Amino acid sequence: MAYEEGLVKAVGVSNYGKDALRACHKSLAERNIKLASNQIQFSLLYRYPLENGLLDTCKELDVKVLSYSPLALGFLTGKYSAANLPTGPRKKLGEKLFQSGNLSGLLEAMAIVSANHNGAPLSQVAINWCRAKGTIPIPGARTLKQARQNLEALDWNLSADEVRLLDEASAQVPAYIEADKSPFPKADINTGLVMFDS
């Protein structure tokens, strides 16, 4: 194994649900190897790992959570609205999210938090919500300005009241990707255990 040969410093997995994570953790522990991380989708618009207990399992096993897509394909940056939808495959998703009216409510809650922090970009609010849930967000950036804004999210934290406000607003938005329709594999190829288990 690359870890045992000293080629890598840590071992991590991606998109493992609770059962697959436990199986992997146990298998590695038998070889005296720590499972360092689980990279999963997580955001104000994709709370499934929080709701199904995966974040709790990661915490219990001392596995760091790397949360990808914390900006939910750009929908949590404030750049899109019902009148300004993205083009391409994300357009239908945008229509669904804005039709309910609840995404607008979430963005309004994010704007309230932003105002509490000198008008911080909504992207920073989204990133800091993930941080407040104990994850390490890994947002994408297309420009140097976006990369800098993402990094500046580390300069401040959400208060407990702000987290609560965002939790409540987020809970009103229907899941934009159903876990059982995820593009990721359903079962670990080695153990056969469900990755997006409930």
What are these regions (language model features)?
Residues 1-169, 173, 190-198:
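Beta/alpha (TIM)-barrel catalytic core signal, keyed to glycine-rich beta->alpha loops juxtaposed to Asp/Glu
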